[in-house]
């Protein structure tokens, strides 16, 4: 089965086919944070979904090149810097650093590129794109000295959000970065400098100012990935106006279809309500860590529901994530220890266990059906535990089972922080198991003490030796 993904543009689930003639390389752009504050868990729902998508595509043999932008100049960042009495670059750097720390805590893979909008090469590209649109008559400079995109020049505007422009009757201009579709109008490509911007300004042929939010992403995406992308992701709140504007300005500049597959993550609620500071249910990752939860527990909770469905994020859900991860940890520990048993028996894994592994990936092939995938994983855990209880698995088979788990975990990134058993300690454990099989208790005790010298404790259980650091 090929990977199938729901395309917001067509509103259909489609076979994923990359632009690469060899069918291997995938160009993926994901809208990153606006670094005016700490990212909240609603943001991280989108970022964990995008991480799951990348990991699954890679598990299926694709080579993903991903770009995630950092919006470090816009209305919000400028207001924040001004309120804090700091230079824009100093103000945003704090939140850039915090964002990368949060990514690592949630085990989200780093993108190949993290372009920041204020980097000179991207500012230059934004100015060049705006200049091209002006030359084509698609953009114009208004009396407020700002440059706007003329919606009438792009009849396909609204197709992504499935808007009927005849009903909305767009008129006038919109200078703010974010607005509702009822206020639709020509959007700003370049905002003329005013006193509120302070030192935030760049020189352009049409006057000093700064780029609008939408042109930033078009410039960075096409600079790093070219004029055509395989996948563009974001939250549903990005569909309009941001992604709609990206399509218009990018395709007018390049003459090519900007994105083949658009994927959008649904909203996150907290305890059944819209997240807000006034309701007391606004969480950053740091807030949850202070409550005693771990990054992987938050990651699990964020991935429990398919990305296209609203997620009700709750403290009870986090506690459920902790319990589920505990069950996974116990199982992984059991099969990890059982492989140290002494046995000459080998054999392939029972078919039902291999089928569960295949079922996990097949579920994710179906538009990242995470519920189906997790169902397959927990069936694998239940059935393999039962087989171990009844003596139906050999150490060699559990070693193969562990490999299946490792391939699953490369996608989920759920495993407990790894405690790597040094090779010399593992060798001592195997020697001790052989000594016990030979009933050489003196050698067994000596090897146990030698293992302890290396900083490890070995306990004998019905499933074999269990190792833990001292």
Residues of each region from the PLM?
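Alpha-helix C-terminal capping/helix-coil junction sites
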Residues: 58, 104, 134-135, 263, ...
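Short, well-structured beta-strand/strand-turn elements
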Residues: 63-65, 137-143, 457-459
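Structural preference for alpha-helix termini/caps and helix-kink/transition segments
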Residues: 281-470
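N-terminal, positively charged, Ser/Thr/Ala/Gly-biased leader segments
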Residues: 104-114, 120-137
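Alpha-helical recognition segments enriched in aromatics with Gly/Pro capping
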Residues: 1-36, 47, 51, 124-336
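The substrate-binding groove and active-site-proximal loops of carbohydrate-active enzymes
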Residues: 81-88, 114-119, 235
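Short, solvent-exposed turn/loop segments enriched in Gly/Ser/Thr/Pro and often Arg
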Residues: 67-74, 117-120, 237
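N-terminal, positively charged nucleic-acid-binding surface of large information/translation enzymes
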Residues: 10-13, 18-109, 467
